[in-house]
């Protein structure tokens, strides 16, 4: 066996042991489940998919649900497939997985989450190696990914974050190969990977133009015409899955949309822009800083601020106000999807008309999005969320500096994924910290690359 083949075997075995071992601790010693609020939607969709092949958010008790486009189909389809293959008894209620952790539904969610986490760790390690990291950096990435409190929590709940993290990490790996190898197969894999991610979370559509730009820039050894053809193939393959699903939605709902929530997301951000303009930037920053002393000081200094008041009675905050209007606009006889799209257009109009206000709000929203990673429960009452966030941000900045200084296209392709997702959420959503969870494997990979260094390979 050749030396490099031996190293590859050791690499694969090491990653498999670290990834599977750490991930499957979720099955035997799961941490405390923290509901995120979307579990019922995904369980309903998965149950109907497994029972009748219909994508619907109707209550589980509904025997003949009407097809809809309320959520992206990726995770419900995967969970339904796992249920069918495993012969799992379908959940009788949306809350069964949480009320009874030993139920078949709950166990299957954890098993699927563990497999996705192990896959994410393995692909993340391969991406780090492709970006120029050595064996130590790759194995360290796998260990950090599977130890991540936020990713482990995502593996426990029926939601799209775990699947999105696996696919996002695959996109980074494929992009690294695509910008350094002129063969068409890596362009095809890049396009397919980038095309599948929006079927789990619509925000990842931003990866399609990002990937097209990368294919135009590298490999530098190719003439411009060759790079244009590669970018065109990538874009075609990346757009195809979303276009197919949107065509399905056009047939069943009458609207060419990816999911029936994009307008709500944009309008919630527009309402947040208005609230920050009224109440100030600093109260928002204080409310979203994960340090209890800072939050208390902010509440004392600005008692009129309502950023943390998720109350459905009374004024509430930007989120409850926007959602109340969203529901009001969708009441029969209105077309709910048309109402959602109308609110989305209204929000985009506000962003353009009040650009400075939007940019000021973006600073606060970007701050909020930094805190995706959780502090380990074992360290309570010590909370390291803030420290970990700054550490991850510094690592990405450091890795970015290495990429620019060395004109390292491999490292640039690796970082393009988390940076594009971060900017998208900072500009267009309220950026709940969990929105950044799918990018955490690459953030931890940036840590190992920043600490261990990345070997330069400018591409061919």
Ranges and model annotations:
Residues 131, 171-187, 197, 216-221, ...:
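Membrane-interface transmembrane helices that cradle and orient dolichyl/undecaprenyl
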Residues 103-115, 331-415:
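Membrane-interface anchor segments at the N-terminal boundary of transmembrane helices
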Residues 40-70, 74-77, 81-94, 274-288, ...:
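Extracytosolic helix-loop segments that constitute the early lumenal/periplasmic catalytic or substrate-binding loops
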Residues 51, 258-361:
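Membrane-proximal stem/loop segments at transmembrane-domain junctions that anchor or position
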Residues 73, 77, 88-122, 154, ...:
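Loop-to-helix entry region of an early transmembrane alpha helix in multi-pass inner-membrane enzymes
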Residues 37, 109-116, 140-175, 184, ...:
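Multi-pass, polyprenyl lipid-linked donor-dependent membrane glycosyltransferases
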Residues 141-146, 186-201, 212, 237-241, ...:
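Membrane-interface alpha helices of multi-pass inner-membrane proteins
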Residues 90-103, 121-147, 165-166, 180, ...:
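Transmembrane-helix signature of polytopic, membrane-embedded enzymes
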